[in-house]
Amino acid sequence: MGIKLPTLEDLREISKQFNLDLEDEELKSFLQLLKLQLESYERLDSLPDYTPRVKYQRTLGRPPMKEENPYGALVWITSIKGKEEGKLKGKRICIKDNVMIAGIPMLNGSKMLEGFVPHMDATVVSRILDEAGEIVAKTTCEDLCFSGGSHTSYPWPVLNPRNPEYMAGGSSSGSAVAVASGYCDMAVGGDQGGSIRIPSSWVGIYGLKPTHGLVPYTGAFSIEPTLDHLGPMANTVKDVALLLEVIAGRDELDSRQPDSLPPPPVKPYSKLIDGDVKDMKVGIVKEGFNWSNSEKDVDELVLDSAKKLEDYGIKVEDTSIPLHRMGLDIWTPIAIEGATATMILGSGVGWGRKGLFETQIADFFGNSLKSRARDLPNTVKGVLMLGYLMIKMYNNRYYAKARNLSIVLKEAYDSALRKYDALIMPTTPMKAMRYKSEPGFDEYFIMALGMINNTAPFDVTGHPAMNIPVGYSNGLPVGLMIIGRHFEEDKVLKLANVFERIKK
């Protein structure tokens, strides 16, 4: 691409910005030094980049027609097949549109990525194709995934198939609706603040945010590496477990994962869901209920559903984790300042980790930020302004303190999980919010972020957390959330399977 040499004026601006107080003679000396150092950049630029090999051929596909996309769930229809035999043979699978599929346009719900066509397959995509799954669509998601509603997405909003006057939830809105409406058997979603679990709750399906690092994030658009998760969504616990079995496991390209994690399959999750649950203990977390925005019918249905576990020999007790009430406050600086660093200043890829960096995203999104940042959604404009302000004025201390307190928050949950096999609370304090095409400024943000009280803390601590549909109230689904110990998805899925049997 060629590297533009800096000018003296460029260095004057940098000196002024960072209070270096350098005179022009000093700057001229630095200019000569930088030109020498840039020779390494030029040589680096001459080398071919590393991109994972695309293993399977595919046709381009097409945008959906209006009549086949009544709720706005789909953004691109395709048919991509890999091996002929495997665990996912016969399964139709949708992929959230923040995940790269080679040759298929990717919007990430945003005008900012219009025209972007990835050159690589995300690791989860390759693993699905390796096990004979058919990828049938990319699904609509919230604009740059920074919303728990389904009203900010480009090119269209996503409506709730249970009642189209309501939102589907987000940011993995299209994945949830594609599953709920029967378009596919399974879907991959992403979760940094609740984005798998919120739409799963609001449309009434199963959705699992795995332990941080269990499923590789390679080839997906990052918000903040310590919050980034991909996970399975489906109409049955068995299908959630089966998809997790395929996509979980060590990927040498993603440093979010622990080195000790084995390659897939990590565990035979689909075979473990029928395991013995007698003598398991679950704790109902008091602080997950009775928020200022809680709906009484949601709290009551979750409590009643949890008590039914006792019929299966599971001990159910109330427990208290006071710090849970501060979990969202701990998440906020990590999400806002972290997203500012990774998404905005870091052009969608950021710094400070090993593994694969999606340079194609950096080039395209970085250039979009320079030329049309006005097209950013208000959610991300707010993130940019507050994040940059807090970094500049307070020296990154609030991000650092929040990360420190995440250790304390994790230990608070771990302490409870030493007594209990799992914890339970409502996934969201309320049922689906009503969709509005032109909400006021404040209402827009409530629709985007007013439901993440219980979900966001577990993105910070990395615990596995799964939405369980436990019934309806006033025609809308209600979701219960199971939280487990790190890397004990098998126990979470076993409990989920009990709830599924209760429903039947």
Swiss-Prot record:
Q: Does the keyword Hydrolase apply?
A: yes
Gene3D superfamilies attached to this UniProt entry: Amidase signature (AS) domain (3.90.1300.10), Glu-tRNAGln amidotransferase C subunit, N-terminal domain (1.10.20.60)
Active site location? 96 (charge relay system), 171 (charge relay system), 195 (acyl-ester intermediate)
Q: Thermal profile, per the record?
A: Active from 60 to 95 degrees Celsius.
Per the UniProt record, which EC number(s) apply here? 3.5.1.4
Single GO MF descriptor = amidase activity
Name a Pfam family for this protein: Amidase
Describe the pH dependence. Answer: Active from pH 4 to 9.
Keyword Electron transport carried by entry: no
Return the similarity comment: Belongs to the amidase family.
Q: How does it assemble?
A: Monomer.
Q: What does this protein do?
A: Enantioselective, active on 2- to 6-carbon aliphatic amides and on many aromatic amides.
Protein's UniProt name:
Amidase
**Species of provenance:** Saccharolobus solfataricus (strain ATCC 35092 / DSM 1617 / JCM 11322 / P2)
